[in-house]
Swiss-Prot record:
UniProt KW Cell cycle keyword: yes
Organism: Thiobacillus denitrificans (strain ATCC 25259 / T1)
One GO CC term on file: cytoplasm
Protein name: Trigger factor
EC number: 5.2.1.8
Amino acid sequence: MQGNLEVLEGLARRLDISVPVDQLETEVQSRLKRLARSVKMHGFRPGKAPLSAVARQHGAGVRQEVLGETLKTRFGEAVQTHQLRIAGYPRFEPKADASAAAEMTFSASFEVYPEVKIDALDSATLNRPVVELGDADVAKTLEVLQKQRRTFATAARAAAEGDLVKFDYQGTVDGAPFEGGRGEDFAAVIGEGRLLKDFEQALVGLKAGDSKGFDLTFPAEYAARELADKTAHFEVQVKEVQAPVLPPVDAEFAEALGVEDGDVEKLKAEVKSNLEREVKRRVQAKLKEQAMELLLQKSTLDLPRSLVEMEMDRLRRMTEADMQSRGVQSMKLSADMFTGQAERRVRLGLILAEIVQANKLAAQPEQIRSLIQDQAQSYEEPDQVVQWYYQSPERMQEIESLALEENVVAWVADQATVVDVATSFDELMGRA
């Protein structure tokens, strides 16, 4: 009966596994004897408890341990015999109709990995963005850096987008004040999103000394649930308007950004180099997105339910941990919330694994090192970042996964037609 394979619906399989009782009991007795030499039991010195007492207290646990290990071993042997690729973990159940008292018989239920069929990709097209970086792109980036280091100076004019406004406010709902609805000397920059958009727009055009009343409806998803969808009336009194002052792009500015000799041209060259690196990453991301969608469309496979459920649970735990880290009140999420995402991830994972294996696309050491060095270039101490990656097997696994994805994208690009599409930097970054 050992290893009798039953093909069930879809990817489900069942194996009958038998365990000789005499072998099981022999191993149980051997372990109990070893345990008796060191176990501490009430009323006996360490290692002096009689075997019968040790068996009464620990026999059930030891027997379960031995049975579990034996089932795992014999299941592995049967899997090798039938050349099966197991997805997830088997579920063992005792068979009530065991034919011989000399044997314990179990059925192992499990799923196998599916066959992955991928249609030809030669009729498909991938659009590859092509970006020509110019002086204007460098200038825009420098302006962003200037704004990050801006100061503010009092302005004797009406408030506009980008100005810092200092004001007092009082809000009411149905004529009654509410928590957080009153403030003095509150300061906010118009357009930064610290306030609701309608509140910010109400400040535009006001000068120091001006007062204004206006109504505002809180959005349905507002964090303070008691205010969601409600209309409040606000009275504001502007105390000061300050206009932004950008630092000049000079030697002092360059030094503040890490250019030791303050050479502005070196700063511009460094900015352009960073932009080129970002363009490369974004282009690769765009190609990857298209390649993955194409593979999902062109592939046919059954999904092992066990893998989907494992991924659903993993996503649930990750989301709960992320919520807790951001101070969101702890709550138990349903794994069913992640069904679609989990199915997509499992499907893609199986497709990619098939392509990597069938086309020998394993990541090479030099490719992994190149990816690590590319990641490290974004930091002030790249050599330390490289060491940080190599010191962690988990981080190295992440980089290897990135390398495999790159290899699959390159393989898809070779199979399909790649069309270069002229794209501005802002379009690539989603800012156009």
